[in-house]
Amino acid sequence: MWFIIFGIIFFIEGIIMTVYGVKKKNGMLTYIGIVFAIMTFGVVMIKLTGH
């Protein structure tokens, strides 16, 4: 259960980083935010499906 909570927190953080990066026109921050969000989402999905 705690894993899902951490996943949601990291996913939201990734989205916030992406939005902040776009507003500041910072390409690297945007890229890191998107990768962070996708990676976290992927790991949570793997854990939820039990593989």
From Swiss-Prot:
Subcellular location(s) per record: Cell membrane
Lineage top rank: taxon: Bacteria
Main location: membrane
GO CC annotations, alphabetized: plasma membrane
Residues passing through the membrane, by range: 4-22, 29-46
Topology class, membrane: Multi-pass membrane protein
UniProt entry keywords in alphabetical sequence: Cell membrane, Membrane, Transmembrane, Transmembrane helix
Name of protein: Uncharacterized protein YflI
Organism the protein comes from: Bacillus subtilis (strain 168)
Phylogenetic lineage: Bacteria, Bacillati, Bacillota, Bacilli, Bacillales
